[in-house]
Amino acid sequence: MRSNPTTSGSEVSAVEKKNLGRIVKIIGPVLDVAFPPGKMPNIYNALVVQGRDNEQTNVTCEVQQLLGNNRVRAVAMSDTNGLMRGMEVINTGAPISVPVGGSTLGRIFNVLGQPVDNLGPVDTNTTSPIHRSAPAFIQLDTKLSIFETGIKVVDLLAPYRRGGKIGLFGGAGVGKTVLIMELINNIAKAHGGVSVFGGVGERTREGNDLYMEMKESGVINEENIAESKVALVYGQMNEPPGARMRVGLTALTMAEYFRDVNEQDVLLFIDNIFRFVQAGSEVSALLGRMPSAVGYQPTLSTEMGTLQERITSTKEGSITSIQAVYVPADDLTDPAPATTFAHLDATTVLSRGLAAKGIYPAVDPLDSTSTMLQPRIVGEEHYETAQRVKQTLQRYKELQDIIAILGLDELSEEDRLTVARARKIERFLSQPFFVAEVFTGSPGKYVGLAETIRGFQLILSGELDGLPEQAFYLVGNIDEATAKAMNLKT
């Protein structure tokens, strides 16, 4: 495919206006457009529908198929209401391009990179096409390194890989949003990095709530928007499938600029990766492709790979991606989640049971996993501590039925000690968050990995057996727990 100049959104020069076609067929969000011979657009080029009497309709489409007989099939990125056969269509000669750089921080964009937050135009002339190749092998940084988050339960039991992909599993109301905001806050403070949030096919209300909470917690700075730590890109579930399918690429393009040009560590959030697959399935059916297993598109693995392979570490910087994964009907063998799992380096599972106990972050220490938790990567000390913590919690889980029926007194001395330590560990895995200060009143804590390991080693060794378990609840490092225990005694 020959390379094209890029155009921002629907900017069209006078020269490009010669490349006019006409709509010959409309089927929902899919348009067939006829062009003059020799003026055919390339695959992925952006087309802009011109209204009657030069009235701009602002419907941008993306070429998906070349049908022959000088016709192309394109998918609309916005509503096709009011479009008619015979309307003029401009070939922009380039893929959809979106604004990139520091001026995107604190703003909300749609799939075309247009701001939708009523704060005026974006102060940048730098744009980038949403379709790019993944970095070449020679550019990749193959060194395995931990991405420290400052969140104890994550760093100890399911550590994130720098430039890796993490699946976030959890129902409504278990603290997913607060965890995401804390990660955005911590990457800015500890790594000098920024974040991009891609809302793919989720509820508009949730997107609005997230924006309001980010403003409240300071992740988005209303007074000085340039001091914000995140850019937001939304393609919500009321939008056509074309927009939902491409909004993930828009967010990724913004993240790639921070990695490649600004040489920063970037966090890319995709909520929800299942909706990306779902939108691709809808588009595939509209384009007339034969469906494969469970009605999904035959190109499912290719589409997922095209997105996921661009999320990686290079020698300049890294994009670490956290993707919320909806599992339809809790069926992990469904092709959509199964294809996603092939790309994940770690999973963070949020538990309603822990949230009900008031233990936040409600990350399940036994269900959450990471490929990074190996002695050759994290070191013997970290690995041993994590395994002993998991064994203690697993034994406590096994004993819970006996405790519920017979009571603690019927357990052996050894088991009673295990239960006491497990309850301390469970509480010590909780942590006050910076972004939750406005709700809880207690200051947030960033706990380094070395401090985290030291704290759990002290609990496991029995040195802190004499302290009350409530001293370990919602504290930062272990020194705070011992200080809290002293206060409880007085």
Curated annotation (Swiss-Prot):
User: What GO molecular functions are on record for this protein?
Assistant: ATP binding; ATP hydrolysis activity; proton-transporting ATP synthase activity, rotational mechanism
Task: Give the EC class as a word.
Answer: translocase
Write out the annotated subcellular location. Plastid, Chloroplast thylakoid membrane
Residues that bind ATP: 170-177
Q: Which reaction does it catalyse?
A: ATP + H2O + 4 H(+)(in) = ADP + phosphate + 5 H(+)(out)
Alphabetized UniProt keyword annotations: ATP synthesis, ATP-binding, CF(1), Chloroplast, Hydrogen ion transport, Ion transport, Membrane, Nucleotide-binding, Plastid, Thylakoid, Translocase, Transport
A Pfam cross-reference name = ATP-synt_ab
Q: Which SMART domains match?
A: AAA
Q: Which HAMAP family match?
A: ATP_synth_beta_bact (MF_01347)
Assembly, per entry:
F-type ATPases have 2 components, CF(1) - the catalytic core - and CF(0) - the membrane proton channel. CF(1) has five subunits: alpha(3), beta(3), gamma(1), delta(1), epsilon(1). CF(0) has four main subunits: a(1), b(1), b'(1) and c(9-12).
Q: Quote the protein name from its UniProt record.
A: ATP synthase subunit beta, chloroplastic
Provide the taxonomic classification: Eukaryota, Viridiplantae, Streptophyta, Embryophyta, Tracheophyta
Name the gene behind this protein.
atpB
